[in-house]
Amino acid sequence: MQTYPTGYTESHRMAEKIFREILPRHSMAVREEQIALCHEVLDTLYNKEISLCEAGVGTGKTLAYLVGCILWQMNRPERMKLPIVISTSSVALQDAILTEYLPDLSAILLDEGIITAPITAVVRKGKERFVCDARLAERASLVQLSRKRQKNSLHIAENILDMDHIPELSRYDRCRICVPQSCPRDCFLRLDCRYQQYLRDFRKPDIQICNHNYLLANASHRLEERPLLLRQYQALVVDEAHKLPDAARQMYTETLSAKDMDDLCSLLQQAHFKGLSKRLRTVFLTLSISCTPSFAMPKRKISIPFSLTPFRQAAIADCINLLQYIGSQPDMPHYLQYRLAETESLLRLFLLDVPTRILYLEFSADGQLTFCAASNRVPQLLRSALWNTREPTILTSGTLTAAGDFDHTKQLLGLAAYAPLRHFRAESPFNYRKKCLLYIPAPVSYTHLTLPTT
């Protein structure tokens, strides 16, 4: 018989009370699928397991897992309490959790005396998404008064730290005012820096919210024993879990674009290696020419498999030899040595027949070339990065099954051989046949269109 830690029965009892009594008093309907999902979340957390939870549209899955996580966290011993991580695919869901779901739920639970302090949460994202006050001041001083829209966006940035919420901010300005990878120790705004204050204010949140890429980046840091991006956590919820394999494929794909090549040459020139920069541009240009397709390029992004022709082999070898030579210069700065070695390492993959890599060339709509080396071991990498930690995990989405079967999703997520693995399905309460509308675009001809009679 399974024995549960103290608080298991109380958590399930309180979940029933919240969904059947408390939330209805605040104009929320009782949904049986939502209650069942909350109980599944609690069982998964207390058993320290992984659960695949498919919850159809209208189930109320977000509130279900939030209540489950809060009740579980509430009933844990104080010394064992750590944050819970919620990973999503979309910024919209992150914002909804942070500004709607959690504040409303926190207020209700405080009012009912279930919790004694507000639930705290923070969205974790890369520092390049936040405003650097020093760089903002410098950038604002350079923009002409006639550029009213640009001036207005920069003025808004003085009061909004997160650049994702600044309207009409150009990509160019984002790059010029974002927090740098390394803040100078002698920064004149360090004591008044909004970003540093943001970090201080959210050192110990109850819930950390991030996107799938940030979650995977944190896992990579842990495996490589580098400083973690997320504070150590005790449970993980992956919402929009059907998007996690796509994020992993992106994360585990190395790329070298035409812009990367141009940037590297520009950095060399700025570091007073003009002759070497010119030589590198020449071999990069030869490499790009060797990869030009023999067919007419369509006006859209395309990807084609990479094949190693003698011309390409010679061009790549020339690039690698020159990159090695430049990197060996005694007065070469460390940051440039790193960039040169990184570029060399990726190009070397295109010379070797690496069985764990899928090599292809990507061309943008305007014909710009990118070398791509994708891993064909994404499921294994996901398992190593996320599931082998044995932290309780809930993966939820409205689309995790195919004809009621989780097998395909388990394969993509690296969970095919994982045990024990829980499964849960809640059908959408909506009657799609009666309530869905079919919209037909205006250009479609109705002459030969036959609509169903039922």
Feature-to-residue mapping (PLM):
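A substrate-engagement module of RecA-like helicase motors
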Residues: 2-24, 29-32, 76-208, 212-213, ...
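Walker A/P-loop
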Residues: 48-65
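Structural recognition of the conserved hydrophobic beta-strand(s) that form the central parallel beta-sheet
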Residues: 86-87, 210-211, 237-238, 393-396
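A contiguous, basic/glycine-rich beta-loop/short-helix subdomain that forms a polymer-engagement track
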Residues: 184-203, 221-227, 328-436
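Signature of the SF2 helicase/ATPase Hel1-core->accessory helical subdomain module
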Residues: 190-204, 212-311, 401-412
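Conserved small/polar residues in nucleotide/adenosyl-binding loops
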Residues: 447-453
